[in-house]
Swiss-Prot record:
One Pfam family here: RuBisCO_large
Modification sites for N6-carboxylysine: 205
Binding of Mg(2+), residues: 205, 207-208
Lineage of producing organism: Bacteria, Pseudomonadati, Pseudomonadota, Alphaproteobacteria, Rhodobacterales
Catalytic activity: 2 (2R)-3-phosphoglycerate + 2 H(+) = D-ribulose 1,5-bisphosphate + CO2 + H2O; D-ribulose 1,5-bisphosphate + O2 = 2-phosphoglycolate + (2R)-3-phosphoglycerate + 2 H(+)
Subunit structure: Heterohexadecamer of 8 large chains and 8 small chains.
InterPro entries xref list: RuBisCO, RuBisCo_large_chain_AS, RuBisCO_lsu_C, RuBisCO_lsu_C_sf, RuBisCO_lsu_fd_N, RuBisCO_lsu_N_sf, RuBisCO_lsuI
Source organism superkingdom: Bacteria
Name under which the protein is recorded: Ribulose bisphosphate carboxylase large chain
Alphabetized Gene3D superfamilies for the sequence: Ribulose bisphosphate carboxylase, large subunit, C-terminal domain, RuBisCO large subunit, N-terminal domain
Entry function: RuBisCO catalyzes two reactions: the carboxylation of D-ribulose 1,5-bisphosphate, the primary event in carbon dioxide fixation, as well as the oxidative fragmentation of the pentose substrate. Both reactions occur simultaneously and in competition at the same active site.
Length: 487
């Protein structure tokens, strides 16, 4: 669909006498354009209104996300407008989705402020999603040049250093979210944390909406949680942690909470995605300066990532967060209660953990991405998972992942500590079997049953949750046509 390779009106007399021109005529469409290594590339899924030409719609996306407005302006002549215009350079029908098109847009690097995700988002998604000629639009993927990557500090700790600090290697890390999310007193909250850590978990965590409410002030929570962490560390001889949620109404308050977490000896703090890009980059800098691991809860993402025809793919959010600088990121489970096609979720994990992402259409990765020297992010699998799924989780995601069993720990019929022990034994059994060459995909359930014979907590977990699944159709799957290079 690129037959309209060049439609720009370059004659200045005609151009500036025209008043209103189509975006393609203003220079925002160039079907012959070859993207440069230094361009920022974006792939949009667009649904034009009836009667709107897809190429004109693509040009409008390029224009409205760079320099255009609805009419020709004389001040274009005061700029290097040919360089500053984004260029839509390819439009393709989305396979199996009538009326939807993939449009590829290239942006010159000079359009963006270095080291600022806020500026990237203001340009790429700031205006075009409300544009009337489009029924819907979704940002599917982006590619950033290495030159731009190097303007970001990235994760403050990274997977390698985190494992060194924890002295834990060769297996996924285990965690749990304290439940119920809201309503516990500080003392009871701390007791839950202690039981989980003593039972074998590496981390316990606050949930996204526990901040500083009347039933439990944040200081009380921090004090009781760190008392629990220190006691569990002493009892088990392992480094333990609790994700202390420092999310607050102002940056000043977030820093105040982070400082107390540091004074109390915490190795990790947590913020929610909803604090915003500037706050995320700011607290990441603080974590880097204070040798603190930064856990990111993706609270709110589903409002704009879940529907495949409008919004932003989570793989793009994951890229922005790696650049902004987080160490942990919730990326989905594929087998739990939250939205997640297995291949698509693996694409999110690869975005976090690989130093170079190759094109992988089944996993939704449309561009090769070289991450330069940015550290890797530890993905987190959380939401409706239990010990009976351990073989699936290990098979899907490998070792570099935090597996968080909230209800699958706190809801154990023998108690919280038993729930933690069940998860730890299930994990250790799976890792041992895998290292001995067992195919976890086919033999995993049998490995669990054998381990449960000498572990009552695991046996009880399998009895209660063994058949629990969340088999619903995923709303966000990759649309692509297999090519010779992608099977």
């Amino acid at each position: 669909m690129n037959e309209m390779s060049k439609s720009e009106i370059t004659d200045k007399k005609k151009r500036y006498a025209a008043g209103v021109l189509k975006y393609a005529q203003m220079g925002y469409w160039d079907g012959d354009y070859q993207p440069k290594d230094t361009d920022i590339l974006a792939l949009f899924r667009i649904t034009p209104q009836d009667g709107v030409d897809p190429i004109e719609a693509a040009a409008a996306v390029a224009g409205e996300s760079s320099t255009a407005t609805w009419t020709v302006v004389w001040t274009d002549r005061l700029t290097a407008c040919d360089q500053y215009r984004a260029k839509a350079y390819k439009v393709e029908p989305v396979p199996g989705q009538e009326g939807q098109y993939f449009c590829y847009v290239a942006y010159d690097l000079i359009l963006f402020e270095e080291g600022s995700i806020a500026n990237v988002t203001a340009s790429i998604i700031g205006n075009v999603f409300s544009f009337k000629p489009l029924l819907a639009a979704r940002l599917e993927d982006m590619r950033f040049p290495v030159a731009y990557m190097k303007t970001f500090a990235g994760p403050p700790t990274g997977i390698v250093v985190e494992r060194e600090r924890l002295d834990k290697f060769g297996r996924p890390l285990l965690g749990a979210t304290t439940k119920p999310k809201l309503g516990l007193s500080g003392k009871n909250y701390g007791r839950v944390v202690y039981e989980g850590l003593k039972g074998g978990l590496d981390f316990m965590k606050d949930d996204e909406n526990i901040n500083s409410q009347p039933f439990m002030h944040w200081r009380d929570r921090f004090l009781y949680c760190m008392e629990a962490v220190n006691k569990a560390t002493a009892v088990t001889g392992e480094v333990k942690g609790h994700y202390l949620n420092i999310t607050a109404g102002t940056m000043e308050e977030m820093y105040r909470r982070a400082e107390l977490a540091k004074e109390l000896g915490s190795v990790i703090v947590m913020v929610d995605l909803i604090v915003g890009w500037t706050a995320i980059q700011s607290i990441s800098n603080w974590c880097r300066q204070n040798d603190m691991i930064l856990h990111m809860h993706r609270a709110g993402h589903g409002t704009y990532t879940r529907q495949k025809n409008h919004g932003i793919s989570f793989r793009v959010i994951a890229k922005w967060l790696r650049m902004a600088g987080v160490d942990h990121l919730h990326c989905g489970t594929a087998v739990g209660k939250l939205e997640g096609d297995p291949l698509t979720v693996q694409g999110y994990y690869n975005t976090c953990r690989e130093m170079v992402n190759e094109v992988d259409l089944p996993r939704g990765i449309f561009f090769e991405q070289d991450w330069g020297n940015l550290k890797k992010v530890m993905p987190v699998a959380s939401g409706g998972i239990h010990a009976g799924q351990m073989h699936q989780l290990l098979d899907l995601f490998g070792d570099d992942v935090v597996l968080q069993f909230g209800g699958g720990t706190i809801g154990h019929p023998m108690g919280i500590q038993a729930g933690a022990t069940a998860n730890r034994v299930a994990l250790e059994a799976m890792v041992l079997a895998r290292n001995e060459g067992v195919d976890l995909k086919t033999e995993g359930p049998e490995v669990l049953r054998r381990a449960a014979k000498w572990c009552k907590p695991l046996e009880a977990a399998l009895d209660v949750w063994g058949n629990i699944t969340f088999n619903y159709t995923s709303t966000d799957t990759s649309d692509f046509v297999p090519t010779a290079s992608v099977s």
